[in-house]
Amino acid sequence: MTIKRKACIAGVYEHPTRHAPDKSLAQLHAEVAQGALADAGLSIADVDAYFCATDAPGLGPMSMIDYMGLKLRHYNSTEVGGASYTVHVAHAAEAIAAGKCSVALITLAGRPRAEGMATGTTPRVYNPAAPDVGFEAPFGPVTANMYALCAMRHMHEFGTASEQLAWVKVAASHHAQHNPHALLREVVTVEEVMASPMIADPLHRLDCCVITDGGGALVVVAPEVAKSLKRPKINLLGAGEASKNPSGGKVDLTYTGARWSGQRAFEEAGVKPGDIQYVSIYDSFTITVVMTLEDLGFCEKGRGGRFVADGNLISGVGKLPFNTDGGGLSNNHPGNRGSMTKVIEAVRQLRGEAHSKVQVKNCALALAHGTGGSIGTRHASATLVLERE
């Protein structure tokens, strides 16, 4: 079953806060839900499907369904880390195409900043019973050093330089300066990225994403519902999912699951990488962006460093503007899960609602990509191709 043009994104909302010590998780979920529904011109009573991941407090989606007073025909709580929300968009479209629902609400919320969570340097053990724990935990894997391993290997194989990775952060900062809600709005240089403290060689502090509270929400609807709303019609053209694993230790750190998820999304959409005018790329670290761009086909494998160092990611300058809200590197990474805001900014670009300084002229085709887990071990990749009708 194809989902091409079988569903539309009608509402988006990003919570303006980046620090929420005064709000509960449930409150944040409800606030972003209200915001996205208001953006779509719909109400809670219109929602007949709800999608969330384990950031939602309580028993799967059940507690938030009760808290928000939802009356549903369908729900889904797929959990694949930071890629969960790009996956949810695809799954919502599938449910709509199958006739299981017509208005799907997707929410994300988190409070890692308020809770003082040391996200990048805490042991990466999700569940002591997981089969991989005994093989990896003794070596002390944390988020930062697993991504650093990928960066180091990419440098060894392809000659990528730290200065090239820094250009990803430079591009993000150029965009974030125009976002009044961005956590970091100061434009930085390659030299400043290189001078920031080393976190896990070769990744510096400014190679790492921000830690923020807040959240976001999306409303995915059937085409007939979209036609009745006073919002630009944003169609889902294609979607792809993939996972990549160490395969019993035979891991290649130079590529990600985007190699497969991107191909599937492009095939369903019937477009090529060269057709895309704007990209939202998961940016947990600068190396994540470089490798993902390569694997999605926007540049040759091993040439991602050169591609970004040529300024290609800066809106108004390069050939492939990315993360024009500032992305996870400068703007927002709510709950340490970045794919929600990637979809939100892609929709803004397609609607022509991004800041005028970063808006892509006549943007009609965009891509949003999420990564969940760690590209250094097992991870999920999910790619969406979106179209303005």
What are these regions (language model features)?
Residues 1-83, 91, 95, 150, ...:
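Conserved active-site "lid/cap" helical segment
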Residues 80-110, 144-178, 218-224, 333-354:
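Active-site-proximal alpha-helical scaffold in enzymes
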Residues 133-139, 160-164, 180, 303-307:
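Molybdopterin (Moco) oxidoreductase catalytic core of the xanthine/aldehyde oxidoreductase family
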Residues 1-26, 133, 167, 198-260, ...:
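Condensing-enzyme catalytic core mediating Claisen C-C bond formation in acyl metabolism
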Residues 255, 259, 263-286, 295-298, ...:
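Extended C-terminal subregions enriched in glycine
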Residues 44-53, 74-76, 104-109, 163-170, ...:
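Beta-strand segments within the central parallel beta-sheet cores of soluble alpha/beta enzyme folds
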Residues 56-67, 248-252, 283-306, 313, ...:
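Short glycine/threonine-rich loop-to-helix capping motif typified by GTGT followed
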